Amino acid sequence: MGEITNVTEYQAIAKQKLPKMIYDYYASGAEDEWTLQENREAFARILFRPRILIDVSKIDMATTVLGFKISMPIMIAPSAMQKMAHPDGEYATARAASAAGTIMTLSSWATSSVEEVASTGPGIRFFQLYVYKDRRVVEQLVRRAERAGFKAIALTVDTPRLGRREADIKNRFVLPPFLTLKNFEGLELGKMDQASDSGLASYVAGQIDRTLSWKDVKWLQTITTLPILVKGVITAEDTRLAVENGAAGIIVSNHGARQLDYVPATISALEEVVKAARGQLPVFLDGGVRRGTDVFKALALGAAGVFIGRPVVFSLAAAGEAGVRNVLQMLRDEFELTMALSGCTSLADITRNHVITEADKLGVMPSRL
């Protein structure tokens, strides 16, 4: 293979390099994988309305997220068990994010602990949290994240049960024996037992609390001063509840299309959420972002920034830290080019008028120009 020219090319390399069980775990979605495909295809249906004859000799992509300044509105989403992809795992991802001047979100189910990731050096990091049946575990995780200098909690709210991921069932997916879920070492929650279907599905059924509700968001606010992002919101109704319950922000996410199939692509759900939020909290997006053009489209539809997941693990598998650095750089370069060719010199210049969605094509568009 010649020089890698875009983010997607890393996936084919990862597929060659990784054992089938591990590649399938990262790559697959729930059931028919309709939403998995739609997360990408929905971006392709959004077109640009570029503005011309604007001085774009200087472009500023910097932004702030929850008060933290970052170099670009492209951040790293939580992806579990990264040492399955590469021996350096989350260490490499943390270093790459820090070098790029952006945020890394560490998964609860990481194969490196919060303390280990913090030891890689300075960086703005968020901690993704699942709520366990044993609330003492949750409290302990939050305290450790605080002590390790993590700046926010990304609370995953779309996983009362694990989605039906048929590739994992076929492969009888289980965390390889040489790895553990490092944040749970010593809690007897760090290992995943072999199961007749998917070891992860059995693990979730045994540990994750299905009673999770908005009252638990309130409870979390009593045990930490860290801002709480609610990850997994795709409707206006839940957006309004997130605002009412004091969320610091929302991540529009369908869990990489790994939970409920036939939910909309996140880019399709974004505007509904943004409108319901009414500017009261920032709205972010993950799911299907593979190009700088995707980043621009998300911002034009009201996102404050995007998170990338699979591109990180695929590039990590292919080339370790250098791969993740390259993915972040390629997306940055593409996004900068898209801004220039659209006539935007800062993120504030990117407006709803820069894009045409399916709804616009049905005749809604002229009213807003």
From Swiss-Prot:
This is Glycolate oxidase 5. Keywords: Flavoprotein, FMN, Glycolate pathway, Oxidoreductase, Peroxisome, Photorespiration. It is an enzyme of class 1 (oxidoreductase). Homotetramer. GO terms for biological process: oxidative photosynthetic carbon pathway; photorespiration; regulation of photosynthesis; response to other organism; symbiont entry into host cell. It catalyses: glycolate + O2 = glyoxylate + H2O2. Pathway: Photosynthesis; photorespiration; glycine from 2-phosphoglycolate: step 2/3. Belongs to the FMN-dependent alpha-hydroxy acid dehydrogenase family. The record marks 109 as: Involved in determining the substrate specificity of glycolate oxidase. Its cofactor is FMN. It comes from Oryza sativa subsp. indica (Rice). Catalyzes the oxidation of glycolate to glyoxylate, with a reduction of O2 to H2O2. Is a key enzyme in photorespiration in green plants. GO terms for cellular component: peroxisome. A motif (Microbody targeting signal) lies at residues 367-369. One of its GO terms (molecular function) is FMN binding. FMN binds at residues 78-80, 107, 128-130, 156, 231, 253, 286-290, 309-310. Glyoxylate binds at residues 25, 130, 165, 255, 258. Its EC number is 1.1.3.15. The keyword Oxidoreductase applies. Its main location: other. The active site is at residue 255. Residues 1-360 form the FMN hydroxy acid dehydrogenase domain. Coiled coil: none annotated. It is found in: Peroxisome.
